[in-house]
């Protein structure tokens, strides 16, 4: 990145920020879709039941922990690969 001029660095930063936002929104969408379809079965009420709320909380926690672990493993792999 040191070899890029200021304009190129700014463009690269914008591209990376847009990609990061897209990935975040994709993760949020996946989490929402998965947890909703796994936990919400009763559509007779406009509010979530206690059981549904607990299920969604557990589902979201599990999903986020899994995503964090995958990120850690990727970072470990990348560090090992770059060290070769």
Swiss-Prot record:
Check the record and name the PANTHER family matching this protein: MITOCHONDRIAL IMPORT INNER MEMBRANE TRANSLOCASE SUBUNIT TIM9B
Give the protein's recorded name: Mitochondrial import inner membrane translocase subunit tim9
Name the residue ranges of motif: Twin CX3C motif.
35-59
Chief location of this protein?
A: mitochondrion
Which BP terms from GO are recorded? protein insertion into mitochondrial inner membrane
Q: Name one GO molecular function term.
A: protein transporter activity
Instruction: Give its localization.
Output: Mitochondrion inner membrane
What broad taxonomic lineage does this protein's source fall under? Eukaryota, Fungi, Dikarya, Ascomycota, Taphrinomycotina
UniProt free text on domains: The twin CX3C motif contains 4 conserved Cys residues that form 2 disulfide bonds in the mitochondrial intermembrane space. However, during the transit of TIM9 from cytoplasm into mitochondrion, the Cys residues probably coordinate zinc, thereby preventing folding and allowing its transfer across mitochondrial outer membrane.
Q: Which InterPro entries match?
A: Mito_inner_translocase_sub, Tim10-like, Tim10-like_dom_sf
Query: Could you give the subunit structure recorded for this chain?
Result: Heterohexamer; composed of 3 copies of TIM9 and 3 copies of TIM10, named soluble 70 kDa complex. Associates with the TIM22 complex, whose core is composed of TIM22 and TIM54. Interacts with the transmembrane regions of multi-pass transmembrane proteins in transit.
């Amino acid at each position: 990145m040191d070899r890029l001029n200021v304009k190129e660095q700014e463009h690269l930063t914008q591209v990376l920020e847009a990609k990061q936002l897209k990935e975040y929104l994709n993760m949020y969408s996946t989490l929402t879709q998965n947890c909703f379809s796994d936990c919400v079965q009763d559509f007779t009420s406009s509010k979530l039941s206690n059981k549904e709320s607990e299920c969604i909380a557990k589902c979201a926690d599990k999903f986020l922990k899994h995503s964090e672990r995958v990120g850690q493993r990727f970072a470990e792999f990348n560090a090992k690969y770059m060290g070769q």
